[in-house]
Amino acid sequence: MGKEKTHINIVVIGHVDSGKSTTTGHLIYKCGGIDKRTIEKFEKEAQEMGKGSFKYAWVLDKLKAERERGIQIDIALWKFETPKYYITIIDAPGHRDFIKNMITGTSQADCAVLVVACGTGEFEAGISKNGQTREHALLAQTLGVKQMIVACNKMDSTDPPFSEARFGEVTTEVSNYIKKIGYNPKSIPFVPISGFNGDNMLEPSANMPWFKGWSVERKEGTMTGKTLLEALDSVVPPQRPTDKPLRLPLQDVYKIGGIGTVPVGRVETGILKPGMIVTFAPQNLTTEVKSVEMHHEALQEALPGDNVGFNVKNISIKDIRRGSVASDSKNDPAKETKMFTAQVIIMNHPGQISAGYTPVLDCHTAHIACKFAELKEKVDRRSGKKVEDNPKSLKSGDAGIIDLIPTKPLCVETFTEYPPLGRFAVRDMRQTVAVGVIKNVDKSEGVGKVQKAAQKAGVGGKKK
């Protein structure tokens, strides 16, 4: 079998009718985890419904419908394989909770595929002030998705079809915009494709002889290719943050007869091992880890990305809960957050947001109301430069630097130190009204409770 391929996560973004579903569906269909029987079933249904031209988008619609109805569809359907990687599509917009998912994200995307439609008039609509192309690209940038691929789709419907001039125009315009928000266009492959007909998806297209291929310059060197598949293979795999101190936000806490209290969550940074002395924030409780398990097997160490359960001594199920964060008591332990400063982008709020506004924040697994205590500055969301001090209010489309105060104990971190614990979604009226990135955290130096087991191991407190 040889070496297992590396896994990477991508998020597919772009305006509503840019052809995201068709393009994604095409990749899954051609390289992916959908078995022949399922495809034949979908094709038959499509013919019966007179949607013969459906092909790929139909596949995705079926998957989406099942996902939204809460049917646990085989997640393999959202995976596909390239010569170099196993790729998982962690989400695609169009979902009600897309933005929230992308932020509290069960996983961080390694690369965003921005799909833009090149058809006459379509591109302009997508990148206009109220199109989603800009919003999604900005969101990807804000949330720390460092790499991007631009798929210039619907090349078959340019005027004339497969127009080199149109591809040039779209490339220039998109480059200018993404440069403003902080991406380097030189490091981004721009691929002219037809997600529907398959041009330049997996094989070079005969319809665009003028396209000599894409070329990108990155610190890893120059890479070239012709197709979208090759562009995906040019993604630089992520470095797992094992060298950072441990942060593990709890998803749940169970009480298991004969074993005791078992917190469950995903290691975001660092390493968790049996015998380690961990501190839970914001509760400030310290105790020893007896054992660590994943998929019912004991682990000697859990690494970033691993979903694990671990057994802790002398801590009751009432002491800790979802949203608590486990950390290494001897290496930058997590603490309760008194106040934090964040750069916030208001996305869709019907009115003005001013000091005193107290919506719910979703940050890692925590879900807690926080008060916008002070609007410190309004910034240009494209350049990040300050445009006004102490603004009275912020409205949709604005970005600002804000001080927030949690209404209940909470533990968050700065985005630069611990990215998964430093980005959040602001929820109100059942939608995501804003997203934010934490710049600075004021931590409380509370006196904690150290369990007997941990005292023996020589942590805090006087030995009795």
UniProtKB/Swiss-Prot annotation:
Record-given protein name: Elongation factor 1-alpha
Pfam families linked: GTP-eEF1A_C (PF22594), GTP_EFTU (PF00009), GTP_EFTU_D2 (PF03144)
Predominant location category: cytoplasm
SUPFAM superfamilies: EF-Tu/eEF-1alpha/eIF2-gamma C-terminal domain, P-loop containing nucleoside triphosphate hydrolases, Translation proteins
Keyword tags: Cytoplasm, Elongation factor, GTP-binding, Nucleotide-binding, Phosphoprotein, Protein biosynthesis
Domain (tr-type G) ranges: 5-242
TM ranges: none
GO molecular function terms attached to this record: GTP binding; GTPase activity; translation elongation factor activity
Superkingdom to which the source organism belongs: Eukaryota
Record-listed 5-glutamyl glycerylphosphorylethanolamine modification sites: 301, 374
HAMAP family: EF_Tu_A
Record InterPro entries: EFTu-like_2, GTP-eEF1A_C, P-loop_NTPase, T_Tr_GTP-bd_dom, TRAFAC_GTPase_members, Transl_B-barrel_sf, Transl_elong_EF1A/Init_IF2_C, Transl_elong_EF1A_euk/arc
Alphabetized PROSITE patterns for the sequence: G_TR_2
